[in-house]
Amino acid sequence: QIRVFSQSMNVKTATSRHLPRIGGCFACALDGCFGSHDAALNAPYADETGGEGVLYYDDQKVMDFCKEANRAGLQIELHAIGDKAFDQACRAIKAALDDYPREDHRHGIIHDCLPTPEGIEVCRDYHIQMPMQSAFIGWKQEPDDYLERILGHDRLEKLNPIRTFRDNNIVVSFGSDAPCTTPDPIAWMDRAVNNDNAGQAVSVQDALRMCTYNGAWAAFDEQERGSLEAGKIADMAVLSENPYTVPKDKIKDIRVERLYLSGKSYESCRKSILPMMLRGLTSRNKA
């Protein structure tokens, strides 16, 4: 169920541990976030703070890392929220693939909140995937009125362009970014289908695929997971309603009635983990 990314720019560490993936957030974050005004922007923030945010690395550092990781056969993920960081990620991955072309690399850029048209073209042409968080749409911690105040109306309208990525045949998958947003795929579907920016809303079918198959594909797991087919691992959820037939504004009310992992019914543990940990420590001390 878990796929490990070495959240580091140290390629040798990842390869020495036989990890096929590198990147993510933390050490591979190219910028910060809008709320703290350190998401890197191509133009200044619209509020009184001004400034253009922060790029944590210069272009050469990111390009050198991507080239080394790509030549080592690793899958790369980079965090980019602002448009300046998104462009930097696109330049670096493009440079790596120009240096050493790979047919099925599945490199990705995480978040992709404010992409540029030029960056989208690079992602389309170089088959760079988009692991996004549709839960950021209408997110209570950064509501639209706040984002409009710090970014301006024009950039607000360009945030999280899921439909644009989809129309450019760029693979989009949804994740939670927990604990920042809820790890609830039903909520992800709702936000993608009922996007307040109607021009960026996607169909129920597209949203469901972005929550299931595309996520498995993004981790090279589509032969085992992501859809219900003979021979695959039977991870599945039984829902209270059919998302294809309920009114779109009712998708958010759908509940998971049963969960199966590897074909077996799963029941969440309702017991506190603390007593088990204490028993384990006690038994270890006695030994």
Regions found by a protein language model. Give the residues of each.
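Glycine- and charge-enriched low-complexity intrinsically disordered segments
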Residues: 265-285
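Metal-coordinating catalytic core of metallo-dependent amide/deamination hydrolases
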Residues: 1-87, 91, 122, 127-135, ...
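P-loop/Walker A phosphate-binding loop and immediately adjacent motor/lid segment at beta-alpha junctions
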Residues: 248-271
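His/Asp/Glu-enriched, well-ordered alpha-helical/loop segment
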Residues: 67-76, 84-86, 91-107, 117-121, ...
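Short, small/polar residue-rich loop motifs at catalytic or cofactor-binding pockets
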Residues: 21, 221, 252-253
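Residue-level signal for well-ordered, solvent-exposed loop/turn and beta-edge residues enriched
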Residues: 33, 232, 264-266
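Active-site glycine- and acidic-residue-rich loops that bind
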Residues: 6-11, 108-117
